[in-house]
A protein has these predicted regions:
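Extreme N-terminal starter segment of soluble prokaryotic enzymes
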Residues: 2-4
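Short Gly/Pro-enriched turn/cap motifs at secondary-structure boundaries
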Residues: 9, 20-21, 56-62, 113-117
Length: 235
């Protein structure tokens, strides 16, 4: 089977090509992609910037995706063709020191969908069964494609111990910053502050629940948040 894909061929060289869809191994799932987000990592890859891994072209980027199961390997049991799914782009080895000590994010042998192996900027993507998660019809495909960035932000909320009454300062109003702002509000933060130079983003933040916005090009951020008694080490 042949599919169309956006293939990274080198610095600032992204081409739409027809490429074969890889047959799944026994523990793999072929997903027909419905939506795939464009992450900041994808932008860095396109511009040839150094990032979380050494990207070697040709490669299909994209790691924030949702879709429908098209085909499964012989040993797959948890999903079947037709299931609505989202994918975890990280395939940890489970065998290295970090994996065995609960620090999988430092896995020495991590396989990254869209960074070290082909990803979701394509009609189809192949993942291991353990990386595939079903979701209900109550969730749209475009919403499910946001599962990966939202999960990153949820982890940050936990690490920052955001709770009822917290004061939260978010630096930057890009997609991740806006998600963090909303999640902090859901976690109970009473003061939600965004530092962002772009006016449109500051206005959007106020619509999403920010209690104050700051233009760091015109204001001293530390002075602007002094009324909260927030300290630098708390941000």
């Amino acid at each position: 089977m042949i599919m169309k894909a956006a293939v990274y061929c080198g610095k600032e060289d992204l081409r739409v090509k027809e490429v074969p869809v890889r047959e799944p191994e026994d523990n793999e799932v072929v997903i027909r992609v419905k939506y795939c987000g464009v992450c900041g990592t994808d932008i860095h890859i396109f511009h040839g910037d150094g990032g979380c891994c050494d990207v070697k072209p040709p490669l299909i980027p994209g790691h924030e995706f949702s879709g429908v199961v098209e085909k499964v390997g012989a040993a797959v049991k948890t999903v079947k063709p037709g299931d609505r799914v989202a994918g975890n782009p990280n395939d940890m080895c489970g065998e290295c020191y970090f994996c065995k000590n609960g620090k999988e994010h430092f896995c020495e042998n991590n396989i990254g969908v869209g960074t070290t192996v082909d990803g979701g900027f394509a009609e189809y993507v192949v993942l291991r069964e353990k990386q595939v998660y079903k979701f209900s019809e109550n969730l749209s495909f475009i919403e499910a494609a946001m599962a990966e960035p939202i999960s990153c932000c949820l982890n940050a909320i936990d690490l920052c111990n955001v709770q009822m009454g917290s004061t939260v300062l978010v630096i930057g109003g890009g997609p991740i910053g806006m998600i963090m702002l909303q999640l902090a509000g859901y976690a109970g933060a009473s003061k939600l502050i965004l530092s962002e130079p772009v006016e449109e983003k500051r206005e959007q933040a106020l619509k999403l629940g920010a209690t104050k916005t700051i233009n760091p090009l015109e204001e001293n951020v530390q002075e602007a948040v002094s009324y909260t008694h927030l300290r630098a080490h708390e941000t």
